[in-house]
Amino acid sequence: VISAEIMQVHHQKHHATYVNNLNAAEEQLAEAIHKQDVTKMIALQSAIKFNGGGHINHSIFWNNLCPSGGGEPTGPLAEAITRDFGSFEAFKEKMTAATVAVQGSGWGWLGLDPTSKKLRIVACPNQDPLEGTTGLKPLLGIDV
């Protein structure tokens, strides 16, 4: 259970800051492109990755939430979890292990490998977005 206060801080402060900082970096990037200032373009990459990743990750996170909890998945997702991890319990254990292993801040992800069509559990540091850094399609993200 996540408190309403934590969710408000996350949404109104953290996520809003990522969006505002991303917008500012994009404006600076547009100016650097217009001026053909390659040094400035390169310097902005880390701000775009961090703040863009924070926006992407939190947008996925909000879409994953359910008012009374999600319970166990059903249908094709449940079948894929059983196929790739053995059981829902085994999936939860592996997801927990990967997520608690994150040092500092980061994300634990359940992602779909578009080539093999298999589910994978991956941890990403900081605000690195899953798809942009691994190519996996994000299905479930846990903010650490």
Swiss-Prot record:
Keywords: Manganese, Metal-binding, Mitochondrion, Oxidoreductase. GO terms for molecular function: manganese ion binding; superoxide dismutase activity. Its EC number is 1.15.1.1. One of its GO terms (cellular component) is mitochondrion. It is found in: Mitochondrion matrix. It catalyses: 2 superoxide + 2 H(+) = H2O2 + O2. InterPro entries: Fe/Mn_Superoxide_Dismutase (IPR050265), Mn/Fe_SOD (IPR001189), Mn/Fe_SOD_C (IPR019832), Mn/Fe_SOD_N (IPR019831), Mn/Fe_SOD_N_sf (IPR036324), SOD_C_sf (IPR036314). Its cofactor is Mn(2+). SUPFAM superfamilies: Fe,Mn superoxide dismutase (SOD), C-terminal domain, Fe,Mn superoxide dismutase (SOD), N-terminal domain. Mn(2+) binds at residues 10, 58, 143. Binds 1 Mn(2+) ion per subunit. Belongs to the iron/manganese superoxide dismutase family. Homotetramer. Destroys superoxide anion radicals which are normally produced within the cells and which are toxic to biological systems. This is Superoxide dismutase [Mn], mitochondrial. It comes from Branchiostoma floridae.
